[in-house]
A protein has these predicted regions:
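Active-site acidic carboxylates
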Residues: 1-91
Length: 92
């Protein structure tokens, strides 16, 4: 397992908030299990963050037409990692 890395995909407000159309009501239940996995991987964790593209061309045009609430600047707080995920992204 020393060469194995944990990847935590998009633990962001946009997917966690109950007020977000993409929010999952089960999101709070993943925090403790991920905390335990992050500890077990001893610094070998990568955390991703979804942000909208700068240009809305190609397939993204239809996507943002459908999900207009997500058509925001990439620095909008809705795309921030949830507070609990901040330590997962820290580098020693």
């Amino acid at each position: 397992m020393s060469q194995t890395w944990l990847i935590v995909i998009d633990p962001q407000t946009i997917f966690a908030s109950p007020t977000s159309p993409w929010g999952s009501p089960a999101f709070p239940t993943i925090i403790d299990p991920i905390d335990r996995m992050v500890a077990a991987f001893h610094g070998r964790t990568i955390v991703t963050r979804w942000i909208p593209t700068a240009t809305r061309c190609g397939s993204w045009c239809d996507y943002f037409d459908r999900w207009t609430f997500a058509d925001r600047p990439a620095n909008d707080p809705i795309f921030d990692l949830v507070d609990e995920a901040q330590p997962w992204a820290e580098r020693p």
